[in-house]
């Protein structure tokens, strides 16, 4: 096996550690790396109190971009809650505007942006403990919480007038350039 592996999901790292496929990091490595990462970030590589990994990067996702000039021209107020956001989307559709541009095409990785939406919605609709139980496999995808959130995302995406998809459909539109 390799000396170093990159795990895109902390849950897979935890599973591999618990199954005995990983060795703990040396204390000096953990100490050195922890000087540059928060306890929360270090927690992604910590399994049951033992440090098996460290972050190698972070991604900033889950942002909603908007055009301030269009908001001003239409008299829209920037929402601060999810309920306000959905109320605004209804107003935008009634005004003939399309609230979202969404694309999930990403070659063999198509669909990861859907999971980002689901993760965001899980965190907004349920507790952090529920989210953690889901990401560690304790809460199955078939649970009411997870399946309900997935359905909510699909309902948003399938609302007539809600989504602009440059490629003709959300699945065939690249996540990279849908807003162009």
Where are these regions (language model features)?
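Short helices/loops that flank or line small-molecule/ion binding pockets
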Residues: 1, 19, 70-71, 87-95, ...
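Periplasmic-binding protein-like
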Residues: 2-7, 101
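Hinge/lid segment of periplasmic solute-binding proteins
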Residues: 8-62, 86, 113
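Stable alpha-helical elements in mature extracytoplasmic
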Residues: 9-12, 21, 41, 67, ...
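Short helix-initiation/N-cap motifs at beta->coil->alpha
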Residues: 10-11, 82-86, 166-180
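Extracytoplasmic/periplasmic solute-binding protein
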Residues: 47, 52-56, 62, 86-142, ...
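Aromatic-glycine-rich donor-binding/catalytic loop that engages nucleotide-sugar donors
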Residues: 69-79
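Glycine-centered hinge/linker elements that transmit conformational signals in sensory
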Residues: 89, 135-171
């Amino acid at each position: 096996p390799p000396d170093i592996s990159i795990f895109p999901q902390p849950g897979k790292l935890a599973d591999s550690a618990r199954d005995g496929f990983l060795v703990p990091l040396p204390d000096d490595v953990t100490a050195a790396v922890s000087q540059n990462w928060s306890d929360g970030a270090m927690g992604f590589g910590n399994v049951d109190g033992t440090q098996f990994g460290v972050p190698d990067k972070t991604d900033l996702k889950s942002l909603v971009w908007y055009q301030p000039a269009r908001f001003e021209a239409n008299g829209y107020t920037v929402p601060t809650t999810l309920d306000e956001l959905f109320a605004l989307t209804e107003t935008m559709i009634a005004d003939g505007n399309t609230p979202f541009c969404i694309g999930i095409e990403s070659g063999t990785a198509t669909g990861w942006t859907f999971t980002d939406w689901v993760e965001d919605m899980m965190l907004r609709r349920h507790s952090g403990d529920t989210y953690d139980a889901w990401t560690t496999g304790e809460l199955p995808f078939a649970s009411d919480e997870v399946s309900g959130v997935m359905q909510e995302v699909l309902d948003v995406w399938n609302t007539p007038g809600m989504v602009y998809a440059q490629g003709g459909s959300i699945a065939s539109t690249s996540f990279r350039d849908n807003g162009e």
